[in-house]
């Protein structure tokens, strides 16, 4: 395998991190045992293991939320200054007798004018939560329903919308039950979560005690709450899915997973060669011989829909689901937002889209638009960005504006009528664009970078451009046309994809093949003493980033050293971009100030002109030259 082949390999960051710390085999084993209904009674041993803590530190260090502080005003950079041994010791001591630090509450405004309370734990508690999440996730993933899509690996809102469209198009389920759980995250029953975890096989009493304390952590300025999951914690989304997983399987058991005496399912082979289990004969037999109601659930976090075939069925399902949520999960339904929708006559909103069935030839097909509230939000956002662009008519301003437009296009491109919707938005902001940008921008046909923005060029839409002259050279920056977008139909989630099986990983991720696993293990098991946790974590990813090579030759343990491009005594840091692996003798040459030593090292190394140029640039950065 060549260097260029390696660069093209599919990479999933979380899985690559698992490889760095040899955690993947452990997680795979947990997933397999959970599938076999094993009871887990000693999970704390895995949670406080050295590899798991190092992996947790790496995962939260890369997380954007690590730059947000809790009640103790500490950030990830404060943990990064500790040695990796100190971090491990800290986590282990805290979990011996765990008591969470107070949680900071932050109110986030919602579209309806109300606020959503976020509970932000301290960075240390988030590190501990990450340690727990890494071990619990494979166990829970083995038990979760296959059509829940929120806060789960490899799944997205697009998969949930795609599943809803598929049910509308192919199964003739033309009624949908929309149920809104009243303030779900604030009303979750703590004792119910613990029981559900126990039934999933998580039966480590020490761990359950720790999670129980996390749920009852004091919220600064509010006190201790007896119910609810604090939004903002790393463990919160997983706990929310544990709660609602019972709902998923209850709905599924009413039709989809209903047991039959005879096995009607058949294995069929697609043209692509992929095998799948066909349940159509089972559903046909159930429809003919039982009075069961056809129903399928699609859920994203606490936002879910139940599709059914008639209004009478929908009414019964609505009442039954409402009663089940109250009796089993102790959750109330919001009557104002809960309803039954005839999809042939009305739209139903789901995750920022509105869906409806329209007649086409002799059948009904799903048509989708951007939801009305989201149309208004996008319009307001673009107007706000136009103001900023007028104040900063530069390359940076244009790139910021373009990133907003591109972000909206990428999310809403799966709507079948996305082009029509963005044309409406473009028309509504046209006067604002003209008034704000006409003086500093010229109007011309779009001239984007062909390789990166190819889809816009064929529209021939007039857009605004900003021209900058620098040393007699003119550079043109174009703003992206709002309406230049076409529909890209969403794809259903492939249930073969799984982070915790070898076959499932191969569909999305290629394992490291060029690096020496022996060297990688040595780097992991032998952190540099008196260096920070950030330094020791980055030296592992740096080794893999350089493909285990230096000057196209394999790095050897006894000859490889990490060099700070900008020395720490001159303001340098342990950040990844400030580090580079070099040969021991090259490292001496970089810091060398003696002419004789320099000459001797040059003769020994026999460097090419390209290598000498690189060494000189490193010498200049560290002040040796």
Annotate each PLM feature.
Residues 506-549, 573, 600-607, 612-622:
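Short, charged surface segments at domain edges that flank catalytic/cofactor-binding sites
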Residues 102, 146-147, 152, 159-333, ...:
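Conserved polymerase palm-domain catalytic core
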Residues 393, 397-457:
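Non-catalytic, peripheral interaction segments enriched in hydrophobic/basic residues
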Residues 57-60, 90-114, 123, 127-135, ...:
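Reverse-transcriptase-like RNA-dependent polymerase core
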Residues 180, 552-584, 592-598:
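Histidine-centered nuclease catalytic patch
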Residues 425, 437-530, 607:
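Extended C-terminal regions of large enzymes
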Residues 216, 221, 329-399, 403-406:
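A conserved non-catalytic segment of reverse transcriptases
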Residues 1-85:
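Non-catalytic, polymerase-adjacent accessory regions of viral genome-replication enzymes
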């Amino acid at each position: 395998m060549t260097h260029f082949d390696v660069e093209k390999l599919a990479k999933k960051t979380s899985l690559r991190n698992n490889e760095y710390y040899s955690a993947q085999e452990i997680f795979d084993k947990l997933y397999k045992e959970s599938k076999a209904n094993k009871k887990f009674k000693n999970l704390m041993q895995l949670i406080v293991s050295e590899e798991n803590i190092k992996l947790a530190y790496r995962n939260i260090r890369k997380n954007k939320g690590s730059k947000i502080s809790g009640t103790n005003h500490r950030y990830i950079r404060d943990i990064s200054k500790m040695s990796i041994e100190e971090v491990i010791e800290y986590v282990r001591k805290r979990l011996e007798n765990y008591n969470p630090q107070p949680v900071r509450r932050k109110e986030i405004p919602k579209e309806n004018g109300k606020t959503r309370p976020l509970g932000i734990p301290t960075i240390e508690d988030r590190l501990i939560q990450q340690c727990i999440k890494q071990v619990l996730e494979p166990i829970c993933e083995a038990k979760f329903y296959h059509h829940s899509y929120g806060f789960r690996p490899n799944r997205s809102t697009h998969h949930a919308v795609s599943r809803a469209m598929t049910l509308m198009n192919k199964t003739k389920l033309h009624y949908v039950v929309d149920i809104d759980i009243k303030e779900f995250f604030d009303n979750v029953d703590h004792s119910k979560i613990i029981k559900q975890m126990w039934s999933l096989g998580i039966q480590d009493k020490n761990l359950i005690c720790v999670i129980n304390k996390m749920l009852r952590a004091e919220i600064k300025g509010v006190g201790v709450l007896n119910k609810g999951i604090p939004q903002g914690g790393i463990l919160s989304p997983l706990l929310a899915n544990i709660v609602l997983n019972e709902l998923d399987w209850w709905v599924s058991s009413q039709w989809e997973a209903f047991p039959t005496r005879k096995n009607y399912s058949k294995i069929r082979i697609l043209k692509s060669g992929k095998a799948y289990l066909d349940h159509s004969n089972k559903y046909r037999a159930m429809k003919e011989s039982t009075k069961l109601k056809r129903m399928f659930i699609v859920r994203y976090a606490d936002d879910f829909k139940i599709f059914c075939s008639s209004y009478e069925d929908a009414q019964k399902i609505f009442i039954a689901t409402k009663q089940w949520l109250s009796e089993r999960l102790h959750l109330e339904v919001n009557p104002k937002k809960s309803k039954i929708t005839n999809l042939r006559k009305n739209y139903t909103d789901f995750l920022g889209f509105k869906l409806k069935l329209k007649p086409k030839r002799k059948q009904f097909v799903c048509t989708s638009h951007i939801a009305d509230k989201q149309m208004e939000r996008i319009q307001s956002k673009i107007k706000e960005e136009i103001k900023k662009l007028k104040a900063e008519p530069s390359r940076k301003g244009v790139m910021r504006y373009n990133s907003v437009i591109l972000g909206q296009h990428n999310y809403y491109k799966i709507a079948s009528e996305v082009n029509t919707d963005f044309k409406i938005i473009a028309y509504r902001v046209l006067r604002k664009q003209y008034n704000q940008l006409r003086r500093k921008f010229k109007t011309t046909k779009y001239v984007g970078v062909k390789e990166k923005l190819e889809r816009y060029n064929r529209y021939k839409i007039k857009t605004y451009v900003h021209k900058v002259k620098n040393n007699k050279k003119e550079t043109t920056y174009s703003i992206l046309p709002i309406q230049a977008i076409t529909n890209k139909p969403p794809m259903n989630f492939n249930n073969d994809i799984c982070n915790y099986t070898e076959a499932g990983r191969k569909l999305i991720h290629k394992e490291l093949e060029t690096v020496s696993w022996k060297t990688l293990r040595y780097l992991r098991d032998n952190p540099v003493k008196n260096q920070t946790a950030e330094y020791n974590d980055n030296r592992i990813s740096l080794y893999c980033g350089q493909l285990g090579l230096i000057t196209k030759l394999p790095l050897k343990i006894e000859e490889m050293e990490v060099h700070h491009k900008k020395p720490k005594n001159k303001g340098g840091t342990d950040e990844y971009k400030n580090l580079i692996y070099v040969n021991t003798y090259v490292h001496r040459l970089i810091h060398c100030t003696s002419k004789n030593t320099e000459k001797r090292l040059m003769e020994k190394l026999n460097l090419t002109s390209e290598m000498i140029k690189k060494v000189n640039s490193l010498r200049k950065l560290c002040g040796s030259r």
